[in-house]
Amino acid sequence: MARIAGVDIPREKRIVISLTYVYGIGTSTANKIVEEANVSADTRVKDLTDDELGRIREVVDGYKVEGDLRREQNLNIKRLMEISSYRGIRHRRGLPVRGQKTKNNARTRKGPVKTVANKKK
């Protein structure tokens, strides 16, 4: 298996698909990387030469991926929470951040339903 940015990418798949196994690289970014490294997008990882793999690694090193990207995202969220912005407060409370309604749904963010016992009628 070839390692790019600390991730073992599958050998049998095309290079464009294999690059998407790296956190922070999607299909469009993978296409840009392959084009920048002058490698055919249809080439399978097992058929790549060491030179081509090296060029791809160099290009990927220019992107923020894996641990660096996760760390930056966490720091951004912590910063929002520290300055007590609206978004930071929503993160702190575990509620949707992007303006979604919460009266009915938002169960993914809020967690399982906490039932309250009804008064006896």
Swiss-Prot record:
Residues 91-121 are annotated as: Disordered. One of its GO terms (molecular function) is rRNA binding. InterPro entries: Rbsml_uS13_C (IPR027437), Ribosomal_uS13 (IPR001892), Ribosomal_uS13-like_H2TH (IPR010979), Ribosomal_uS13_bac-type (IPR019980), Ribosomal_uS13_CS (IPR018269). It holds the Pfam family Ribosomal_S13. One of its GO terms (cellular component) is cytosol. The keyword Lipid metabolism does not apply. It comes from the Bacteria. Keywords: Ribonucleoprotein, Ribosomal protein, RNA-binding, rRNA-binding, tRNA-binding. SUPFAM superfamilies: S13-like H2TH domain. GO terms for biological process: translation. Located at the top of the head of the 30S subunit, it contacts several helices of the 16S rRNA. In the 70S ribosome it contacts the 23S rRNA (bridge B1a) and protein L5 of the 50S subunit (bridge B1b), connecting the 2 subunits; these bridges are implicated in subunit movement. Contacts the tRNAs in the A and P-sites. Belongs to the universal ribosomal protein uS13 family. Part of the 30S ribosomal subunit. Forms a loose heterodimer with protein S19. Forms two bridges to the 50S subunit in the 70S ribosome. This is Small ribosomal subunit protein uS13.
